[in-house]
């Protein structure tokens, strides 16, 4: 989801190869593209495979420097990278207890103490970033940090945990972002197959 949303938001053309998960040949198809055996994976025009969302988006920022995929300000960029890395490496309890399922609407399900701890930390990150940037996104304009938290927004839409007013408004803005709505529409179509 993350690199897809970033590419769409910045209007960068790409070819998508859909590999259905949970099929007998899924792993083999993925291994044909990336040695990690995981998705997503970006294959550059030079034929190089880049996997892991954050590495993909760093590569995209390098390949397309005309787009401010990271904040231009050095201090803001460092903070954006920090919260992106925290998202990449953390929040395991949220991921485990509130899996991302676009079609799910299950308020309150998965609200374990550990998941709620993760949610409180995310709420604090968003609130702090939005206060410092004056929004509408975490660092003013949409950037990689916002893309990193897009799957969390989907979880919050499904499970509806209690959030601050600031974070709920941010989640709503993210959900309404054209690139995110396009991803949701495609995900729903794919789920219906």
What is each residue range found by the language model?
Residues 166-193:
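Long hydrophobic alpha-helical segments typical of transmembrane helices together
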